[in-house]
Protein backbone atom coordinates (compact mmCIF):
# COMPACT_ATOMS: atom_id res chain seq x y z
CA UNK A 1 0.00 0.00 0.00
CA UNK A 2 1.39 3.41 -0.94
CA UNK A 3 1.78 6.22 1.56
CA UNK A 4 -0.87 8.24 -0.28
CA UNK A 5 -3.47 5.44 -0.07
CA UNK A 6 -3.22 5.50 3.74
CA UNK A 7 -4.27 9.18 3.78
CA UNK A 8 -7.87 10.20 3.18
CA UNK A 9 -8.59 12.42 0.17
CA UNK A 10 -9.57 15.25 2.53
CA UNK A 11 -6.26 15.01 4.41
CA UNK A 12 -4.38 14.97 1.11
CA UNK A 13 -6.18 18.18 0.13
CA UNK A 14 -5.29 19.77 3.48
CA UNK A 15 -1.62 18.87 3.01
CA UNK A 16 -1.59 20.49 -0.42
CA UNK A 17 -3.35 23.57 0.94
CA UNK A 18 -0.80 23.88 3.77
CA UNK A 19 2.02 23.71 1.22
CA UNK A 20 0.72 26.60 -0.93
CA UNK A 21 2.07 29.56 1.09
CA UNK A 22 5.45 27.85 1.38
CA UNK A 23 5.56 27.29 -2.38
CA UNK A 24 4.78 30.96 -2.87
CA UNK A 25 7.54 31.92 -0.42
CA UNK A 26 10.13 30.03 -2.47
CA UNK A 27 8.77 30.95 -5.91
CA UNK A 28 11.72 31.38 -8.31
CA UNK A 29 14.16 31.23 -5.39
CA UNK A 30 17.33 29.12 -5.42
CA UNK A 31 17.62 26.28 -2.91
CA UNK A 32 20.95 24.48 -2.55
CA UNK A 33 20.61 20.91 -1.25
CA UNK A 34 23.63 18.97 -0.03
CA UNK A 35 22.85 15.27 -0.33
CA UNK A 36 25.27 13.31 1.82
CA UNK A 37 26.72 9.93 0.98
CA UNK A 38 25.22 8.42 4.13
CA UNK A 39 21.83 9.94 3.30
CA UNK A 40 21.80 8.32 -0.15
CA UNK A 41 21.18 4.89 1.35
CA UNK A 42 19.30 2.39 -0.78
CA UNK A 43 18.24 2.91 -4.37
CA UNK A 44 14.58 3.49 -3.47
CA UNK A 45 15.61 6.29 -1.08
CA UNK A 46 17.75 7.94 -3.76
CA UNK A 47 14.94 7.70 -6.31
CA UNK A 48 12.51 9.24 -3.82
CA UNK A 49 14.94 12.11 -3.27
CA UNK A 50 15.20 12.57 -7.05
CA UNK A 51 11.41 12.79 -7.40
CA UNK A 52 11.28 15.40 -4.64
CA UNK A 53 13.93 17.48 -6.43
CA UNK A 54 11.88 17.34 -9.64
CA UNK A 55 8.83 18.46 -7.66
CA UNK A 56 10.75 21.52 -6.46
CA UNK A 57 11.64 22.45 -10.03
CA UNK A 58 8.04 21.92 -11.14
CA UNK A 59 6.84 24.38 -8.47
CA UNK A 60 9.08 27.19 -9.82
CA UNK A 61 11.90 26.62 -7.32
CA UNK A 62 15.48 26.47 -8.60
CA UNK A 63 17.16 23.47 -6.91
CA UNK A 64 20.93 23.02 -7.00
CA UNK A 65 22.13 19.64 -5.71
CA UNK A 66 25.59 19.04 -4.23
CA UNK A 67 26.28 15.42 -3.37
CA UNK A 68 28.82 13.72 -1.17
CA UNK A 69 30.07 10.17 -1.41
CA UNK A 70 32.26 9.28 1.55
CA UNK A 71 30.91 5.74 2.09
CA UNK A 72 31.04 4.98 -1.64
CA UNK A 73 34.63 6.24 -1.86
CA UNK A 74 35.59 4.11 1.14
CA UNK A 75 34.04 1.03 -0.47
CA UNK A 76 35.93 1.55 -3.73
CA UNK A 77 39.24 2.18 -1.95
CA UNK A 78 38.75 -0.99 0.06
CA UNK A 79 38.09 -2.98 -3.11
CA UNK A 80 41.33 -1.66 -4.57
CA UNK A 81 43.30 -2.33 -1.40
CA UNK A 82 43.97 1.35 -0.69
CA UNK A 83 43.87 2.25 3.00
CA UNK A 84 41.72 5.22 4.07
CA UNK A 85 43.22 7.65 6.56
CA UNK A 86 41.51 10.63 8.18
CA UNK A 87 42.63 13.71 10.10
CA UNK A 88 40.30 16.27 11.68
CA UNK A 89 37.36 14.53 9.99
CA UNK A 90 38.80 14.89 6.47
CA UNK A 91 40.06 12.11 4.23
CA UNK A 92 43.81 12.31 3.62
CA UNK A 93 43.94 12.23 -0.17
CA UNK A 94 47.19 11.22 -1.84
CA UNK A 95 47.85 10.99 -5.59
CA UNK A 96 46.39 7.49 -5.89
CA UNK A 97 43.35 8.34 -3.79
CA UNK A 98 42.41 11.54 -5.65
CA UNK A 99 42.04 9.54 -8.87
CA UNK A 100 39.59 7.19 -7.16
CA UNK A 101 37.76 10.07 -5.47
CA UNK A 102 37.27 11.82 -8.81
CA UNK A 103 36.12 8.62 -10.48
CA UNK A 104 33.54 7.87 -7.77
CA UNK A 105 32.25 11.42 -7.22
CA UNK A 106 32.22 12.85 -10.76
CA UNK A 107 31.61 9.47 -12.36
CA UNK A 108 29.43 6.85 -10.75
CA UNK A 109 27.60 8.82 -8.03
CA UNK A 110 27.03 11.99 -10.05
CA UNK A 111 25.76 10.22 -13.15
CA UNK A 112 23.59 7.85 -11.14
CA UNK A 113 21.86 10.74 -9.38
CA UNK A 114 21.49 12.61 -12.68
CA UNK A 115 19.87 9.49 -14.13
CA UNK A 116 17.39 9.19 -11.26
CA UNK A 117 16.34 12.85 -11.61
CA UNK A 118 15.94 12.53 -15.37
CA UNK A 119 13.92 9.32 -14.99
CA UNK A 120 11.62 11.21 -12.61
CA UNK A 121 10.92 13.79 -15.32
CA UNK A 122 13.56 16.40 -14.58
CA UNK A 123 16.43 17.69 -16.69
CA UNK A 124 19.52 17.24 -14.55
CA UNK A 125 23.00 18.29 -15.63
CA UNK A 126 25.91 16.57 -13.90
CA UNK A 127 28.94 18.74 -13.20
CA UNK A 128 31.78 19.18 -10.75
CA UNK A 129 33.56 22.28 -9.51
CA UNK A 130 36.25 21.83 -12.17
CA UNK A 131 33.78 22.42 -15.01
CA UNK A 132 33.99 25.98 -16.26
CA UNK A 133 36.40 26.72 -13.40
CA UNK A 134 33.28 26.90 -11.26
CA UNK A 135 35.07 26.38 -7.93
CA UNK A 136 38.71 27.30 -7.44
CA UNK A 137 40.36 25.91 -4.32
CA UNK A 138 43.61 26.05 -2.41
CA UNK A 139 45.27 23.31 -0.40
CA UNK A 140 43.61 22.72 2.96
CA UNK A 141 45.56 22.19 6.16
CA UNK A 142 44.47 21.18 9.64
CA UNK A 143 46.14 21.18 13.03
CA UNK A 144 45.58 18.35 15.48
CA UNK A 145 46.87 17.75 18.99
CA UNK A 146 49.30 14.88 19.50
CA UNK A 147 47.55 12.47 21.94
CA UNK A 148 50.77 11.90 23.91
CA UNK A 149 52.32 15.36 24.13
CA UNK A 150 49.17 17.44 23.46
CA UNK A 151 51.33 19.55 21.15
CA UNK A 152 49.50 20.76 18.05
CA UNK A 153 50.94 19.83 14.69
CA UNK A 154 50.00 20.65 11.10
CA UNK A 155 48.70 17.67 9.14
CA UNK A 156 49.27 17.35 5.40
CA UNK A 157 45.89 16.31 3.97
CA UNK A 158 47.23 15.82 0.47
CA UNK A 159 44.88 16.84 -2.32
CA UNK A 160 42.13 18.22 -0.07
CA UNK A 161 41.05 21.75 -0.87
CA UNK A 162 39.22 24.73 0.59
CA UNK A 163 37.07 26.79 -1.81
CA UNK A 164 38.57 30.19 -2.60
CA UNK A 165 36.32 31.43 -5.40
CA UNK A 166 33.03 30.41 -7.01
CA UNK A 167 32.48 31.50 -10.61
CA UNK A 168 28.74 31.50 -11.32
CA UNK A 169 29.01 31.85 -15.11
CA UNK A 170 28.13 28.21 -15.83
CA UNK A 171 25.52 27.84 -13.09
CA UNK A 172 23.73 30.99 -14.24
CA UNK A 173 23.32 29.39 -17.67
CA UNK A 174 21.39 26.53 -16.04
CA UNK A 175 19.45 27.99 -13.12
CA UNK A 176 16.00 29.23 -14.06
CA UNK A 177 16.00 27.37 -17.38
CA UNK A 178 14.31 24.14 -16.22
CA UNK A 179 17.73 22.53 -15.73
CA UNK A 180 18.84 21.06 -12.40
CA UNK A 181 22.58 21.29 -11.65
CA UNK A 182 23.96 18.26 -9.81
CA UNK A 183 27.44 19.05 -8.51
CA UNK A 184 30.25 16.77 -7.35
CA UNK A 185 32.49 18.45 -4.73
CA UNK A 186 35.70 18.57 -6.73
CA UNK A 187 37.60 21.77 -7.44
CA UNK A 188 40.74 22.88 -9.19
CA UNK A 189 43.63 25.07 -8.12
CA UNK A 190 44.86 28.00 -10.17
CA UNK A 191 47.60 25.68 -11.39
CA UNK A 192 45.14 22.99 -12.48
CA UNK A 193 45.50 20.56 -9.57
CA UNK A 194 42.36 18.62 -8.70
CA UNK A 195 41.20 18.89 -5.08
CA UNK A 196 38.72 16.85 -3.09
CA UNK A 197 36.49 19.28 -1.15
CA UNK A 198 34.28 18.41 1.82
CA UNK A 199 30.73 18.34 0.42
CA UNK A 200 29.28 20.51 3.21
CA UNK A 201 31.98 23.13 2.65
CA UNK A 202 31.48 22.98 -1.12
CA UNK A 203 27.71 23.40 -0.78
CA UNK A 204 28.16 26.32 1.62
CA UNK A 205 30.48 28.09 -0.81
CA UNK A 206 28.11 27.58 -3.75
CA UNK A 207 25.06 28.64 -1.72
CA UNK A 208 26.88 31.74 -0.49
CA UNK A 209 27.90 32.76 -4.00
CA UNK A 210 24.34 32.26 -5.24
CA UNK A 211 22.82 34.09 -2.25
CA UNK A 212 20.46 31.13 -2.01
CA UNK A 213 17.19 31.43 -0.13
CA UNK A 214 17.95 28.18 1.69
CA UNK A 215 20.81 25.73 2.11
CA UNK A 216 19.70 22.28 3.20
CA UNK A 217 22.36 19.93 4.57
CA UNK A 218 21.01 16.37 4.41
CA UNK A 219 23.02 14.22 6.80
CA UNK A 220 22.62 11.01 8.81
CA UNK A 221 21.48 12.76 12.02
CA UNK A 222 18.20 14.56 12.88
CA UNK A 223 19.92 17.94 13.27
CA UNK A 224 21.75 19.73 16.09
CA UNK A 225 21.15 18.03 19.43
CA UNK A 226 21.34 19.46 22.94
CA UNK A 227 23.22 17.77 25.79
CA UNK A 228 20.16 15.59 26.45
CA UNK A 229 20.30 14.43 22.81
CA UNK A 230 17.07 16.26 21.99
CA UNK A 231 16.68 18.10 18.71
CA UNK A 232 17.21 21.86 18.78
CA UNK A 233 14.76 23.16 16.14
CA UNK A 234 16.03 26.73 15.88
CA UNK A 235 19.40 28.45 16.41
CA UNK A 236 20.78 31.91 15.76
CA UNK A 237 24.42 32.33 14.76
CA UNK A 238 25.14 33.58 18.28
CA UNK A 239 23.43 30.57 19.86
CA UNK A 240 25.37 28.20 17.61
CA UNK A 241 28.71 29.74 18.56
CA UNK A 242 27.86 29.45 22.26
CA UNK A 243 26.99 25.76 21.86
CA UNK A 244 30.30 25.13 20.11
CA UNK A 245 32.16 26.94 22.90
CA UNK A 246 30.46 24.97 25.70
CA UNK A 247 30.89 21.62 23.96
CA UNK A 248 27.22 20.94 23.21
CA UNK A 249 28.07 20.99 19.51
CA UNK A 250 31.09 18.73 19.09
CA UNK A 251 32.87 16.34 16.77
CA UNK A 252 31.71 16.20 13.17
CA UNK A 253 28.83 18.59 13.84
CA UNK A 254 31.24 21.51 14.40
CA UNK A 255 32.37 21.85 10.75
CA UNK A 256 28.77 21.47 9.59
CA UNK A 257 27.61 24.31 11.82
CA UNK A 258 30.63 26.41 10.84
CA UNK A 259 29.60 25.91 7.20
CA UNK A 260 26.10 27.08 8.12
CA UNK A 261 27.49 30.22 9.76
CA UNK A 262 29.75 30.95 6.78
CA UNK A 263 26.85 30.57 4.33
CA UNK A 264 24.62 32.88 6.37
CA UNK A 265 27.36 35.50 6.53
CA UNK A 266 27.65 35.29 2.73
CA UNK A 267 23.96 36.10 2.29
CA UNK A 268 22.11 32.76 2.41
CA UNK A 269 18.62 33.24 3.84
CA UNK A 270 18.70 30.27 6.20
CA UNK A 271 20.44 26.92 6.62
CA UNK A 272 18.80 23.71 7.81
CA UNK A 273 20.54 20.53 8.99
CA UNK A 274 18.16 17.62 8.48
CA UNK A 275 18.15 13.82 8.46
CA UNK A 276 18.38 12.74 4.84
CA UNK A 277 17.10 9.27 5.73
CA UNK A 278 13.70 10.73 6.68
CA UNK A 279 11.27 10.12 3.80
CA UNK A 280 10.64 13.32 1.82
CA UNK A 281 12.85 15.32 4.21
CA UNK A 282 13.29 18.15 1.69
CA UNK A 283 9.54 18.53 1.17
CA UNK A 284 8.84 18.35 4.91
CA UNK A 285 11.28 21.19 5.54
CA UNK A 286 10.21 23.47 2.71
CA UNK A 287 6.47 22.82 2.40
CA UNK A 288 5.14 22.19 5.93
CA UNK A 289 4.47 24.55 8.83
CA UNK A 290 6.57 22.58 11.33
CA UNK A 291 9.52 21.84 9.06
CA UNK A 292 12.18 19.37 10.17
CA UNK A 293 15.73 19.39 11.51
CA UNK A 294 17.55 22.45 12.87
CA UNK A 295 17.17 25.86 11.24
CA UNK A 296 20.19 28.14 11.72
CA UNK A 297 19.68 31.81 10.95
CA UNK A 298 21.14 35.24 11.64
Swiss-Prot record:
InterPro entries: AceGlu_kinase-like_sf (IPR036393), AcgluKinase_fam (IPR004662), ArgB (IPR037528), Asp/Glu/Uridylate_kinase (IPR001048), NAGK-C (IPR041727). Its EC number is 2.7.2.8. The keyword Zinc does not apply. It catalyses: N-acetyl-L-glutamate + ATP = N-acetyl-L-glutamyl 5-phosphate + ADP. The record marks 34, 256 as: Transition state stabilizer. GO terms for molecular function: acetylglutamate kinase activity; ATP binding. This is Acetylglutamate kinase. The gene is argB.
